[in-house]
Amino acid sequence: MPFTFGQRWISDTESELGLGTVVAMDARTVTLLFPSTGENRLYARSDSPVTRVMFNPGDTITSHEGWQLHIDEVKEENGLLVYVGTRLDTEETNVTLREVLLDSKLVFSKPQDRLFAGQIDRMDRFALRYRARKFQSEQYRMPYSGLRGQRTNLIPHQLNIAHDVGRRHAPRVLLADEVGLGKTIEAGMILHQQLLSGAAERVLIIVPETLQHQWLVEMLRRFNLRFALFDDERYTEAQHDAYNPFETEQLVICSLDFARRNKQRLEHLCDAEWDLLVVDEAHHLVWSTDAPSREYMAIEQLAERVPGVLLLTATPEQLGMESHFARLRLLDPNRFHDFEQFVEEQKNYRPVADAVAMLLAGNKLSNDELNRLGDLIGEQDIEPLLQAANSDRDDAQAARDELVSMLMDRHGTSRVLFRNTRNGVKGFPKRELHTVKLPLPTQYQTAIKVSGIMGARKSAEDRARDMLYPEQIYQEFEGDTGTWWNFDPRVEWLMGYLTSHRSQKVLVICAKATTALQLEQVLREREGIRAAVFHEGMSIIERDRAAAWFAEEDTGAQVLLCSEIGSEGRNFQFASNLVMFDLPFNPDLLEQRIGRLDRIGQAHDIQIHVPYLEKTAQSVLVRWYHEGLDAFEHTCPTGRAIYDSAYASLINYLAAPEETDGFDDLIKSCREQHEALKAQLEQGRDRLLEIHSNGGEKAQQLAQSIEEQDDDTNLIAFAMNLFDIVGINQDDRGDNLIVLTPSDHMLVPDFPGLPEDGCTITFERDVALSREDAQFITWEHPLIRNGLDLILSGDTGSSTISLLKNKALPVGTLLVELVYVVEAQAPKQLQLNRFLPPTPVRMLLDKNGNNLAAQVEFETFNRQLSAVNRHTGSKLVNAVQQDVHAILQLGETQIEKSARALIDNARREADEKLSGELSRLEALRAVNPNIRDDELAAIDSNRQQVLESLNQAGWRLDALRFIVVTHQ
């Protein structure tokens, strides 16, 4: 190699040293000084791994003094390069800069600079980079982004709600599905969409204390969202790191009690600038016009400050009208400010519901009915649609569907309230009751008599509660020596049932924690039955361990013994056998108990076993629940109302179960009331709301589309290619499971999302749902998203050299494959990628500027190429640098047309979509007050910013491949 003192060279193997200067040489060696690090390197002159740094006209270079020069001309004087051009800071022209005075800290980031500097990547990395660009761009444009990556069943009504709400600006909605329909999943899907799109970055979830850890685990396991759990200890600890402890984390879970207990803490929560607030079990927030509870006021303060709010609550029927109004008031106090007015509005929606029922029935409509529809929708140009809906034409059903959609848009609370019922959602199992009447032991009879004498002054309610749990009465008298489990026939029955069903998982629920603990000891000591215990005295982590042990198939516990808290929030639908060792005091708690197994996704009919003692309050209550309310075998939305009306009579029968006169009449009366209320509820069902929440055929198609995307073979091929190149070990374990572990030669020391001890992955949704230890890999999984970022944010694969063996072309023919990226820069929350994601434009240019990309597909072409080692590649590039530079100039002139077309299409699409959305909502605003002014303002502002950002969109060269034709 011809070396001269003062020349600038770069190391092919240690590019981080920056620019080197020739400072010494002899016949065999040359010494380079790298001023940016102060290090010297001695190389053999004949075959040194260094590349001469030479810039070309059009490049911009930096002097050692920091000013920049745009090169117009390159001269050579005595073997040294002199650059002539315009100085950018002073705009002085004809300025010279000798290569020896170049900035030594020069980093080559442009693909062409890296190529000419000898920083040549492996060919497979170039291919991976192009695929990453292509797939990332496609994924940004795929419908249902944010709904495909969660580890959940594809249940249409859940997807429908999440798809509707997740795309909104700062959604403020009430999720009020019946128990077992998956409100937590819906909330998680909405969060996942908002976070993935950039619409939200900071999220606060407030839940009852008993559900904190469950939410933490669900968000991580199902949605790959890592929340931080804040309690007193974590809050105090975080105060050392920031004035506002909640600003130390982006995603936070805390309990309602934690939030409202301390005034300063609540202020910190309010000041933490959350984008989304989620409140679970919101029906526990007590409100009345005169005396709202502290919990309600705490959430109200937060809801006033946080743009997006999701409230998860019981159904409106269970809540009652006033409580339901209180929830809506949290979402939009301006819209829901007058309770009486709200009640009146609800009555006025009946004609709309009737109209929907009319359309859904599919019968021909009378002129009066057509006129009524026209009045309700209130648009001048609706006549053709009405005629089509009432005709025998092929488009009649489509017209009816559109009319239903228009009615839903214009009336009711359907934009702020989502409520699915079991009637409208298929797929629930049957519930079968098995009662077991057992004799009352003499020990209990004696204890009950004594208790009656000693507790004569107790209220009927207290006596009733005592009578439900005779083992507690007995234990109270006998103290520590009382071993009720030795004679209670329910214990013998339970042991017999469990031993005869060893292979089945059984959930046992009892009211008291002490009962659960005592039963565990008896089952373990007498029969060796593996039983986990779950009660309020355990820490959250201990409860999780107990639940996980119960969930294990082979080595797990056969039975989980829960106190009453076990029937709130925890789901065990992998089990189908429920034993109620005793009965809860009200029908809501009964439904909660059954609801732990009776959930969507339950594969078997639920067997409900109730062993009860005759002549006790248990025998009274089991009859009342079953015969009076039908509450065991069906959900009972009327339960609370009937319980309240029959309370006094029921309490008396429970307090004195031997007094049975009139009890049959009470049961008959309650059953009649139940049937009447049920019919009334059915008649008054908000069909409009149910149709909107359920999604119908549209939701079915949504689930089907996502299921089809699950079968994307491109993902598997890309992921394996990515893991290979990053350096992640892959061990195929069979059954569609692969174990990933870090290696010692990874591109980065710590790959984001890959634990130190590795992880198990699967590309199959069914496998992920059955194996909690396996992560479900989709395009939305952090491993894939982080992998894409790792490749595309750096220069991996941005320059390479290949040989093309093709005897149809002359030896030495040059081709340059260019990958440009057309993109726009904008804040993430604008979601610009919907319209113009970073989009690759591939060119394959020959020496004359002919673009062959359309004739030669990338993967086909890539398979015909062979690799060149870096040293040989550098020599090839240096030999034809001027030719390659000329081809690059031709590429720059050709890319503009393609890029402009992409940008113009994106602007047109963005303007049409956002203007259309704004116009639609503005039109609806006149007839539906549930559309918020701030939502309209946000869409308008978003539209203007998106269009402005697209006006400033540009393009850049992202990667290039230099190809030389050979015949060998």
Swiss-Prot record:
Gene: rapA
Protein name according to UniProt: RNA polymerase-associated protein RapA
Residue ranges crossing the lipid bilayer per the database entry: none
NCBIfam families, per database record: PRK04914.1
Signal peptide, first to last residue: none
Subunit structure: Interacts with the RNAP. Has a higher affinity for the core RNAP than for the holoenzyme. Its ATPase activity is stimulated by binding to RNAP.
PANTHER family: DNA ANNEALING HELICASE AND ENDONUCLEASE ZRANB3 FAMILY MEMBER, SWI_SNF-RELATED MATRIX-ASSOCIATED ACTIN-DEPENDENT REGULATOR OF CHROMATIN SUBFAMILY A-LIKE PROTEIN 1
Gene3D superfamilies: 2.30.30.140, 2.30.30.930, 3.30.360.80, 6.10.140.1500, 6.10.140.2230, P-loop containing nucleotide triphosphate hydrolases, Tandem AAA-ATPase domain
Binding-site positions, ATP: 177-184
PROSITE patterns, sorted: HELICASE_ATP_BIND_1, HELICASE_CTER
Organism encoding this protein: Salmonella paratyphi A (strain AKU_12601)
Motif segment (DEAH box): 280-283
Domain (Helicase ATP-binding) ranges: 164-334
GO MF term list: ATP binding; DNA binding; helicase activity; hydrolase activity, acting on acid anhydrides
